[in-house]
């Protein structure tokens, strides 16, 4: 999936090693997607800085590591998964809101992770919006802000409705996205 081919808005990819608030301010983003990566959220303190600066200003979507960063930023906990999940699909059930609005139930998504969100430690300002058949949290959204996180990879060809989820997210920012 290439977002650049589906919108006329400018898409800028910035490495976590190069991103700063100063850089982002110069770009005046309409939305931010915090992408997957190796390690754990604490390995990338700049992600908390970005959330602190932008969470009340523009929509933010966290994917995998980005999802885990969002959960930790708002007070949740990320733990080791009982077993690493790399290159496996799972069926998820969702609450039909936010980036799931209007999508069918029980669709497949692709997972690549060895960390997961602790379901016993979800902060009150986040709402669980999707789980899989093992009750692993697959998505959250903020209760008041346009902040979303998904544990899986909507950009994967094996994730169903990934384009639709990106469209729902980007439309909140006023970005037109064609599925």
Predicted regions mapped to residue ranges:
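N-terminal beta1-alpha1 cap of cysteine-dependent amidohydrolase-like domains
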Residues: 1-56, 160-179
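Hydrophobic anchor at the start of a short beta-strand
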Residues: 10-11, 60, 147
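Short gly/ser/thr-rich secondary-structure transition/capping motifs
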Residues: 11-18, 41, 90-93, 112-113, ...
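Cysteine-nucleophile active-site neighborhood
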Residues: 26-101, 106, 166
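Histidine-centered divalent metal-coordination motifs
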Residues: 64, 113, 153
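Residues that recognize and position ribonucleotide moieties
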Residues: 90, 108-110, 148-150
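Catalytic beta-strand/loop cores that center a nucleophilic Ser/Cys/Thr
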Residues: 98-144
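C-terminal and late-domain segments of enzyme folds
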Residues: 127-131, 135-141, 146-179
């Amino acid at each position: 999936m290439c977002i650049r081919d589906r919108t006329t808005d400018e898409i800028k990819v910035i490495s976590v090693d190069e991103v700063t608030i100063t850089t982002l301010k110069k770009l005046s983003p309409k939305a931010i997607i915090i992408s997957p990566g190796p390690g754990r959220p604490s390995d990338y303190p700049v992600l908390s800085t970005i959330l602190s600066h932008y969470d009340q200003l523009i929509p933010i979507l966290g994917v995998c590591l980005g999802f885990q960063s969002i959960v930790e930023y708002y007070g949740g906990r990320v733990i080791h998964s009982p077993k690493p999940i790399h290159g496996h699909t799972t069926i998820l059930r969702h609450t039909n809101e936010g980036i799931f609005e209007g999508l069918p139930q029980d669709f497949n998504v692709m997972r690549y992770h060895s960390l997961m969100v602790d379901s016993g430690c979800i902060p009150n300002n986040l709402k669980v919006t999707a789980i899989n058949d093992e009750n692993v949290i697959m998505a959250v959204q903020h209760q008041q802000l346009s902040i979303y996180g998904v544990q899986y990879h909507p950009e994967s060809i094996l994730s169903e409705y990934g384009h639709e989820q990106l469209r729902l997210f980007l439309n909140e920012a006023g970005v037109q996205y064609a599925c």
